[in-house]
Every structure is written in structure tokens, then in C-alpha cells.
Curated annotation (Swiss-Prot):
This is 14 kDa fatty acid-binding protein. Tubercles, muscle layers and body. Its main location: cytoplasm. May play a role in the transport of fatty acids. Binds various fatty acids, such as arachidonic, oleic, palmitic and linolenic acid (in vitro). PROSITE patterns: FABP (PS00214). (5Z,8Z,11Z,14Z)-eicosatetraenoate binds at R107, R127, N128, Y129. Belongs to the calycin superfamily. Fatty-acid binding protein (FABP) family.
């Protein structure tokens, strides 16, 4: 998992507004979500990974073991059941389930770029991050 460890900054985002809309996120919150450029930091402590997301809008942190369900609060305030699977050393798949939607987030690292593909139903967004450290 060393390919994920460190700090990443959002560099480009495509179709994220449509994903937020599909999730029922309010117009005002979507406007904020479309303008912030979050930083995501991944750390490991034994068999637990922590993902810290920081932005001018909100800071969120979740700690998990691969393959084990955990409770997560999303940046738009939803409470979800989440599972992160380690597909390979450079690919993680996270599934978030709430009463209305299932969101699948695939994170893939290639060198100093992390491609994040977010899918809700038939709507997909791609958010690319650049490694800061």
C-alpha cells in the first residue's frame, strides 16, 4: 500500500456535480463541492489505513481495515456503511451504502497521479490527484 501513502491534492475533476446531484446533495453544497480542491493524506498503522481529507469546506478522517465494514460520515453529511478492498498495491475499491444509494469509489495510483473514479448508479465522475509528498 506504500503507493498510496502520503499527501495528494485534487488537480482536476470531471462530472462531479452530476454525481453529487444523483446523491441528492443540495445545490448550495454542490457549488462548494465543485470549487474546493481537497488534500487527501493516507497513512498506515499496522493493518489499519487512515484517509484524512482536508479542504476549506470540511475535514474528514476515516480509519479502516481492508475488507471490514465501518461507519463513515461523508462530506455531504450522509451516514454510510463503507468497505475498502485492496485490489492490488496500487488499487483500492471503496463501496459506500446508504438507504438510497450505493457509491463505488475506485482509487488507482500510477506514479505521482491518483485517479479516483466515483460511480453512483449510471453516473460516473473522475477526480485526479497529484502527489504532494
Amino acid at each position: 500500500m506504500s503507493s498510496f501513502l502520503g499527501k495528494w491534492k485534487l488537480s482536476e475533476s470531471h462530472n462531479f456535480d452530476a454525481v453529487m446531484s444523483k446523491l441528492g446533495v443540495s445545490w448550495a453544497t454542490r457549488q462548494i463541492g465543485n470549487t474546493v480542491t481537497p488534500t487527501v493524506t493516507f497513512t498506515m498503522d499496522g493493518d489499519k489505513m487512515t484517509m484524512l481529507t482536508e479542504s476549506t469546506f470540511k475535514n474528514l478522517s476515516c480509519t479502516f481495515k481492508f475488507g471490514e465494514e465501518f461507519d463513515e460520515k461523508t462530506s455531504d453529511g450522509r451516514n454510510v456503511k463503507s468497505v475498502v478492498e485492496k485490489n492490488s498495491e496500487s488499487k483500492l475499491t471503496q463501496t459506500q451504502v446508504d438507504p438510497k444509494n450505493t457509491t463505488v469509489i475506485v482509487r488507482e495510483v500510477d506514479g505521482d497521479t491518483m485517479k479516483t473514479t466515483v460511480t453512483v448508479g449510471d453516473v460516473t465522475a473522475i477526480r485526479n490527484y497529484k502527489r504532494l509528498s
